A protein has these predicted regions:
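A short glycine-threonine-serine/GTX helix/turn-capping micro-motif
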Residues: 1-7, 92-95
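A short core secondary-structure module
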Residues: 4-26
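Short, cationic low-complexity segments
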Residues: 15, 134-135
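Residue-level recognition of well-ordered beta-strand positions that form the cores
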Residues: 105-109
Length: 245
């Protein structure tokens, strides 16, 4: 109580350091953490995609994230910097004292357009240039990460799968260039050099990773039909070459 105005507040310093990295609407302020551009084929397949939270999901906020992008482009074609948790002092038993320490756990969701090995050096340089030498930057889990992967929508294997699904369902499928979450897909796409296609069978309000995670019977039935047709065409049809480029 007697030190206000005399010593720095770790919570205030950390809050301002975070504000130097991400804006009030969630937009990333460092060019090094953002994709340089969205490939034309990616932008084309996302142009008509409408993002919804489902009956029980959260409402999609149209004005959140990078300005000038659609919600679909923000989640599937752009990077995000998320603050997952933040702590200063002892929130469970607050004292009238300036907190000496503060910590924030953050996450960068990134596409293939940026090398993630450059993220921490870019953040360090950005903070140092703005006088935040007292804010440490590090990575959890001993540097482990799932690297981004993407098979461009105009790839021959994507178009082959599109035709198969359309013939089975009688409807044109929605094509995504990649998912917005973490997947170990780079093991197949990069290490093994295989074209990878994911065919998810779920819906937006499935409560993924929650205690009541679930799937709907009609979607599972449709998924069984789709995959039966896909594997039938795989063994019976005219296939593209087995290569990723």
């Amino acid at each position: 109580g007697n030190w206000g105005g005399l010593i720095s507040n770790a919570g205030t310093r950390l809050a301002n350091a975070l504000a130097a990295l991400v804006g009030p609407k969630g937009e990333i302020l460092l060019p090094e953490l953002r994709p340089e551009a969205i490939p034309p084929s990616v932008r084309d397949v996302l142009a008509d995609l409408v993002m919804r939270g489902g009956d029980n999901g959260p409402m999609v906020e149209e004005d959140w994230g990078q300005p000038g992008l659609t919600p679909a482009e923000r989640v599937f074609a752009w990077n995000t910097f998320e603050v997952l948790a933040i702590k200063a002092g002892n929130p469970d038993q607050v004292a009238n004292a300036i907190p000496p320490k503060a910590v924030a756990w953050c996450q960068i969701r990134f596409t293939v357009d940026r090398d993630p090995d450059g993220f921490l050096p870019a953040i360090r340089a950005h903070l140092d240039a703005r006088g935040f030498h007292d804010v440490a930057v590090g990575q959890k889990h001993d540097g482990f990460m799932m690297r981004a992967s993407r098979l461009l929508p105009d790839h021959p294997w994507v178009q082959w799968a599109r035709r198969s699904l359309a013939e089975t369902t009688g409807a044109e499928p929605t094509i995504l260039p990649n998912l917005g979450g973490s997947l170990p897909n780079d093991v197949f796409a990069e290490t093994l050099g295989l074209p990878t296609i994911w065919v998810p069978h779920s819906y937006a309000a499935c409560s993924q990773h929650a205690p009541n995670e679930h799937a709907l019977a009609p979607l599972l039935r449709e998924g069984l039909q789709i995959m039966t047709g896909l594997f039938w065409d795989l063994g019976d049809g005219d296939l593209p070459e087995w290569k990723t480029v």
